[in-house]
Design a protein with these regions (language model features):
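Motif-centric detector for short Cys/His coordination patterns
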Residues: 2-192
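Active-site environment of non-heme Fe oxygenases that use a 2-His-1-carboxylate facial triad
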Residues: 169-209, 214-464
Length: 464
């Protein structure tokens, strides 16, 4: 879900967003308060031998409030009340048994052989208990399974009773965010207890970017800051980069030219997730302001005001390439590329913006009737991207690094003179998401996610 941040202001044009179910928030102070309330807990794995189940905390239901159960040869139906029922296929229930014989309590991997389950399997009994639905399977494959009520409600698919788990709420922002941009200090990010790291990555998850102040103006300190999140991803530019405008690489970034708002790696099948960069020095010149644009904010306006253009950008693949080095040639697979806007196929949520007009290849994949509509759509997209309402300009200096979600926030710069020294790194989206998920378990655990005094990850975790 997207939220419009009231503290960053909204123009008359973007007020339309509020009618499109965007809720206002009071800047990111609410997030800071939320983080301050989070309690720490150990995340160490249990040392118990395999197949010995760690204590699993299963919420109980009073016997008077037990759901009603009905079953036939295909499904088990659960009546939560007189009006709400969930139906689960028998084979689905058997496949999702999480006893130690069917689901490893330590590795959290499936042990049951899905393909040995008879397709027409039918329980011999299904009964409600305080701990959950207890299912006894037929004598041909004798087994007993227990499913907590909260787990069944969360995973109900016929019908879906709860909104599918998505990423944390995204706070979309305009240029007005310059009044109070999300920021953490270097000391917070590097603190051993990882609370500051959780605050940092939570800002990135909410806003798609975050500044880090007080960074020692050295490549070594910046590299350690990058590694705080996860492995640095190596590309044709190396692992950790430290560069100037000397065209050491065949890319416009290695010049003094202006760069329009873009995401990196559109020529990759899997663009890098995060990009951190730090201006170490700028001597004998001027210019070089950093440009940041929230692609989700711009996409929300495009969808509200120009739904046809939005649809074109969501369905039309755009080929791309990186061909500035004679010994290298990059293009995504398939070569037809990917749309500018990518959505979760289940929830419909916008999950990625992929846009760099400079790296775009020949658009020879358009049908004749699509050509004019596509150019009209990217013209509208460009107009919104480059509006004063969308563009957040900031002059970085030594000691202040910025990290952006390369799947959401576009970046660029103004032209400059003199000599600039910049360093930074890419971090994979999966490494970033893994670190954030682990820190969330540690500092803001879901009641269904932890079990026992050791707070090991529960087999009933919503993420599993």
């Amino acid at each position: 879900m997207w939220m419009a941040c009231s503290s960053v202001g909204v123009s008359a044009r973007s007020m339309l967003l509020q009618r499109a179910s965007f809720r206002a928030c009071n800047s990111h102070r609410g997030l800071a308060t939320h983080l301050a309330r989070a309690s720490a807990s150990s995340s160490a794995l249990s040392n118990k031998p395999p197949l010995k189940t760690p204590p699993q905390s299963v919420p109980q239901v009073a016997s008077d409030d037990l759901p009603m159960i009905s079953m036939d040869d295909r499904k088990v139906a659960i009546g939560w009340d007189t009006r709400t029922w969930s139906r689960f296929h028998n084979i689905w229930l058997r496949d999702h048994c999480r006893c130690p014989e069917c689901f490893h309590p330590i590795t959290k991997q499936r042990l049951v052989n899905t393909f040995e389950i008879p397709p027409d399997i039918t329980p011999s009994q299904a009964e409600p208990t305080a701990d959950g639905l207890r299912v006894s399977w037929p004598s041909s494959q004798p087994h007993v399974s227990l499913y907590p009520w909260s787990w069944l409600q969360r995973n109900s698919y016929d019908p879906a009773l709860k909104q599918r788990e998505t990423q944390l709420e995204k706070i979309i922002w305009s240029s007005k965010i310059q009044a109070s941009p999300p920021t953490v200090t270097y000391e917070e990010a590097m603190a051993e207890d990882e609370r500051g790291l959780y605050k940092w990555l939570s800002h990135v998850d909410h806003f798609g970017m975050c500044f880090i102040s007080g960074v020692p103006p050295t490549p070594e300190a910046t590299e350690e800051l990058s590694k705080r999140i996860g492995f640095i991803r190596e590309t044709q530019y190396g692992k950790f980069w430290d560069f100037t405008s000397d065209l050491a690489k065949g890319d416009t970034a290695y010049t003094t030219l202006a760069l329009g708002a873009h995401t990196d790696n559109t020529y990759y099948t899997d663009p890098c997730g995060l990009q951190l960069f730090h201006l170490l020095s700028h001597t004998e010149g001027s210019g070089g302001s950093t440009l940041l644009v929230d692609g989700f904010y711009v996409a929300s306006i495009l969808k509200e005001l120009h739904p046809d253009a939005y649809s074109v950008l969501a369905r039309t693949p755009v080929p791309a390439h990186a061909a500035g080095e004679p010994s290298e040639f990059y293009q995504p697979y398939p070569a037809s590329g990917y749309p500018v806007l990518t959505h979760d196929p289940v929830t419909g949520e916008l999950i990625q913006v992929r846009w760099n007009n400079d790296d775009r290849s020949v658009m020879n994949n358009l049908d004749p009737y699509q050509v004019e509509a596509w150019y009209a759509a990217i013209r509208t997209w460009h107009k919104l991207l480059t509006s004063a309402d969308s563009e957040y300009w900031v002059q970085l200096g030594p000691g202040t690094a910025v990290i952006v979600d390369n799947h959401r926030v576009l970046h660029g710069r103004s032209a400059f003179t003199g000599r600039r020294r910049m360093c930074g790194a890419y971090i994979g989206v999966d490494e970033y998401r893994s670190k954030l998920a682990v820190l969330r378990e540690k500092f803001n655990p879901n009641p269904d996610n932890a079990s026992g005094p050791e707070t090991t990850r529960s087999i009933w975790s919503p993420a599993l």
